[in-house]
């Protein structure tokens, strides 16, 4: 293993070199069921032809632009999600930490608007919600929080 990667996780000494659907293959060809999906960030399966084709098509058109501008495909996805979820609008995040940070901010804003003086965010023991200061504060694991005090 290399020390060039910051030791944020206790990495297992397994090298995955490719995937097929729900399976990961290591450098020796051994198959493992992918029960984590990139810590549930990309649960799309591996080497999914439809996903790969869609990504390729989009990357040949436009990879990314700022949310300072309108993004038609993002707007269409938001409309579709609004219709099937019953929610009023959507927030697109770049990571789980950013999504959790936004959820905390929305909860606080809601509490503020309702006149809650001292809002409390409830989290589970041994949980992990991200590496930002707010999500680290919400993480129910003192070991992960150690060294980052004072938390928010």
Language-model features: where?
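PLP-dependent aspartate aminotransferase-fold enzymes
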Residues: 79-152
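N-terminal glycine-rich, Lys/His-bearing helix-loop that initiates the first secondary-structure elements
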Residues: 1-89
């Amino acid at each position: 293993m290399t020390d060039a990667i910051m030791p944020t996780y206790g990495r297992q000494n397994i090298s995955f070199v490719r995937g097929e659907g729900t399976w990961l293959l290591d450098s020796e060809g051994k198959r493992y069921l992918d029960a984590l999906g990139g810590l549930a960030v990309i649960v799309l399966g591996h080497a999914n032809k439809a996903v790969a084709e869609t990504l390729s098509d989009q990357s040949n058109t436009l990879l990314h632009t700022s949310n300072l501008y309108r993004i038609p495909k993002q707007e269409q996805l938001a409309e579709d999600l609004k219709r099937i979820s019953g929610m009023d609008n959507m927030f697109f995040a770049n990571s789980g930490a950013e999504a959790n940070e936004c959820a905390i901010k929305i909860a606080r804003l809601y509490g503020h608007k309702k006149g809650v003086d001292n809002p409390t965010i409830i989290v589970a023991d041994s949980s992990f919600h991200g590496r930002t200061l707010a999500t680290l504060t919400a993480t129910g694991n003192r070991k992960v929080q150690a060294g980052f005090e004072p938390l928010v």
